[in-house]
Each structure stands twice: as structure tokens, then as C-alpha cells.
A protein has these predicted regions:
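N-terminal, positively charged/glycine-rich alpha-helical extensions of SAM-dependent methyltransferases
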Residues: 2-34
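Class I SAM-dependent methyltransferase SAM/SAH-binding core
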Residues: 67-118
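Conserved alpha-helix/loop element of class I SAM-dependent methyltransferases that forms part
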Residues: 45-64
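A short acidic, Gly/Pro-enriched loop at the edge of an enzyme's catalytic core
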Residues: 116-128
Length: 212
């Protein structure tokens, strides 16, 4: 299977995929025959466990409504459920990945391009999780503005950003800008191992939204 040889690091052709449709097709192919989940397992992908564990320490309650942005095959949803959370919606660009999510795990699933405005009212969610989506050729920093918009006052935004694109794509500037404007405040920000066996590092950020 050609996907098995693909790496998520700089060697991947994925960082050359500029068009949204190309990224979608890449993941649609990867979703075939459960290859995505198998690769994540093989690569010891610790993103969901590590991120949800960090998030759980600061979450107001287990009943808050969570938006899982770029939910893929539902790995974050499975971890949220395992840690006692019970209300989450998922969104992803790839319909095939969405189709592979176990029934009933998420209350709502939607095919969404996170580089576009999210079709959602302001102040709906108690938290936004975005794990493994800020990487090569994917979702750009303005998505963070949308995450803030759809999150309630004092809600949490928890995300990982591939370290190779953190500065290159301008995530550092966007994060600082939101802090400077008083739209969120930092709860935690640290380096995560992410994919243990592939030597791909990521920044893990946890921010509290401030609505004046």
C-alpha cells in the first residue's frame, strides 16, 4: 500500500499539496481499508492522548460542548470519551475519514473546510480541540480567529501545531496577536513528542477565551 511508506514529516508529499481538494483526496485515499488508523497506531501517534490529558486538567466540566476541528477518524473523540467527556461535535475536510468514525461517538459530524468561515453562531462551544490539523499544506492561522469566535467566554482552545510550520506559516504571530488583543490568555504552551517513532515534534497550546 503506497500510503504505508508516506511519512508525516518533511519527507511527505503532503506539504506540497496547496489546493484544498488535493489535501482532501490525500486523506480520502488514506482512509481506505482503515490504513489511516493503522498507520497512526504503528507510528505511536500520541497527539490525542497527550492533548486531551492536558485539556482535561483545565476543563470546567465533563459536560461542556466541544468542537473537534479536523477530527479525522475520531481519535480525539475516543480519547475525550475515555476521559469522561460526553458532548462533542466533529468536523473534517475528508468525508471518508468522517465515514470511518464509529456511530454515536460524536453527536454531530460535518464536512468542513477549516480555512473557510465555520458555519456556526458565536459563543456556542465550551471548548475547541484541534489536534494534528495545523501541519503542512493544511489549515492556516486565521482558523484560530474562528475558533475564538465560536467559543464561549472562558472556554478553552486546545491545539497542536507541527513545529516545522509554527513560524513558517505565522502561527507564532497569530497566537501573540490574539493575546495582545485580549481575546485569549495562555494556560499552557509546550513541546510535545507527537509521533514518537517518527521524530515529529509539535507545540501543544491551551488558551482560555476572553469575551468582553
Amino acid at each position: 500500500h503506497p500510503m504505508a511508506q508516506k511519512d508525516i514529516g518533511h519527507k511527505v508529499p503532503i506539504h506540497t499539496l496547496s489546493k484544498t481538494a488535493d489535501v482532501r483526496d490525500f486523506y480520502d485515499d488514506w482512509a481506505d481499508k482503515d490504513q489511516y488508523n493503522q498507520d497512526m497506531h504503528d507510528w505511536n501517534y500520541t497527539g490525542p492522548l497527550e492533548t486531551v490529558t492536558a485539556f482535561e486538567k483545565h476543563a470546567a466540566s465533563k459536560d461542556i460542548l466541544i468542537f473537534d476541528a479536523g477530527c479525522g477518524t475520531g481519535l480525539v473523540g475516543k480519547e475525550l470519551k475515555r476521559q469522561g467527556f460526553n458532548a462533542f461535535h466533529g468536523a473534517d475536510l475528508s468525508q471518508k475519514l468522517l465515514d470511518s468514525i464509529p456511530n454515536g461517538l460524536y453527536q454531530q459530524l460535518e464536512k468542513v473546510d477549516l480555512n473557510m468561515p465555520i458555519k456556526c453562531d458565536d459563543n456556542v462551544y465550551g471548548a475547541v480541540m484541534c489536534v494534528g490539523t495545523f501541519t503542512f499544506g493544511h489549515v492556516k492561522p486565521p482558523a484560530l480567529d474562528e475558533f475564538v469566535r465560536i467559543t464561549k467566554d472562558e472556554g478553552l482552545i486546545c491545539f497542536t501545531i507541527n513545529e516545522a510550520i509554527y513560524k513558517e506559516y505565522g502561527f507564532d504571530k497569530k497566537i501573540a496577536e490574539l493575546e495582545m488583543k485580549g481575546q485569549w490568555t495562555r494556560v499552557a504552551f509546550f513541546k510535545s513528542d507527537y509521533i514518537a517513532s517518527k521524530d515529529v515534534g509539535a507545540w501543544l497550546g491551551l488558551y482560555k477565551v476572553i469575551k468582553v
